[in-house]
Amino acid sequence: MELKKKEQSIFVTRTSMPPYEEYVEMIKPLWDTHWLTNMGQYHQKLENELREYLQVEQLSLLVNGHMSLEMAIQAMEFPEGSEVITTPFTFVSTTHAIVRNRLKPVFCDIKPDDFTIDETKIENLITEKTVAIVPVHVYGNICNVESIEQIAKKHGLRVIYDAAHAFGETYKEYGIGCFGDASIFSFHATKVYNTIEGGAVASKSRKLYEKLYNLKNFGIKSENEIIDIGANAKMNEFAAIMGLCNLKYVAKNIQIRKKKVQLYNEQLAGISCLRTPRFDN
């Protein structure tokens, strides 16, 4: 009797892990220093390496992508009740970050081909209460950053990009984190690059970096001075080391992800009721 060959699943996303021995070797010094959190040497090293990799001027590491967005919005100090234009086609975290800052999300429709926010519909949603736009890059497809930033400049709005799906993406040779007033990244275990849990805020502003440095550490500026109502949103050293290890392999992992997307597109091409997103190279 011939046994039927077991079919193997092709996972679109599966947590990328560095070689076990490599990670273990890097965490050994922690048993000597006992410095496990509070912006230790590995936290600082990862900030520097990601700043270079993502081609951004400033980068602040945080405990996850959600807190990165929530604190980036908090740092802008918008008046309570102000409106923020965003997309409903995103993980719930995007909307939660707006609402938790006591702001009102205003949903803008998306484009059917790449699922990013439809920039042609943004201006009709702007009111006297609008203070910002939070566009979301989707599945590696980036928003129309040029049009969005023209609209923002015309109406005096801030732009905070949710770039959780856009690690390593570039536009006209600029890292995607260079656009807007800030861009947030997620390093969750499901992402193509992960620190187990983690996130970051990229920007051109040193002032924003320093503001986030305080906010993610309970608003503490010094032993005797608390200048903001912050929270504990610091990345720990074990997560930072995972990030340092995984950064060596992220280019390979991105290529693996691209091959899987190609395979899915090929296998689903004959199904008339399905349409996959358009991806620009």
Description of each model-found segment:
Residues 178-214, 237:
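Active-site PLP attachment segment
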Residues 74-163, 170:
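PLP-dependent aminotransferase-like
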Residues 41-49, 53-59, 120, 124, ...:
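PLP-dependent aminotransferase class I/II
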